[in-house]
Design a protein with these regions (language model features):
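Short, surface-exposed, low-complexity cationic segments
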Residues: 16-39
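Charged interaction scaffolds used for protein-protein
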Residues: 1-9, 31-44, 64-120
Length: 120
């Protein structure tokens, strides 16, 4: 998947590094042990169409680019004429396709009440 910010096209990668970056910020700590909870934390926000969550997910998925836009540039991209509803849809579909997020997405889809907003 690609997005265009400030006339430059960037790749998005929803692989292991993406998960590591999410897990570094979204985790549960029990008895001094941190357990990554990144994907589980952001998917409900994507389903409910939370723009701040979408911005965070896009920013972390941009890790694959040598020169990636700043979080502020991603925010501005979303605030402009971007078809944000389509972008939510596309990101959720990509998360279902990625080899490293597919199983978690399947489990989340089965457990969350509003999963009809995630297309097959």
């Amino acid at each position: 998947m690609e997005i265009k910010i400030n006339e430059k096209t960037y790749k998005l990668n929803f692989g292991i590094m993406f998960l590591r970056k999410l897990d570094a910020v979204h985790y549960i700590e029990e008895k001094g042990i941190k357990i990554g909870f990144g994907l589980n934390s952001v998917v409900p926000g994507l389903i409910s169409r939370n723009a701040a969550t979408l911005s965070e997910v896009l920013y972390y998925a941009l890790w694959v680019n040598n020169e990636r836009p700043t979080q502020a540039q991603v925010d501005e991209f979303l605030e402009k004429d971007t078809n944000i509803e389509q972008l939510f849809h596309d990101v959720l579909i990509e998360l279902q396709k990625s080899n490293v997020t597919r199983t978690s997405m399947k489990n989340l889809k089965a457990s969350l009440p509003e999963t009809d907003r995630i297309s097959e």
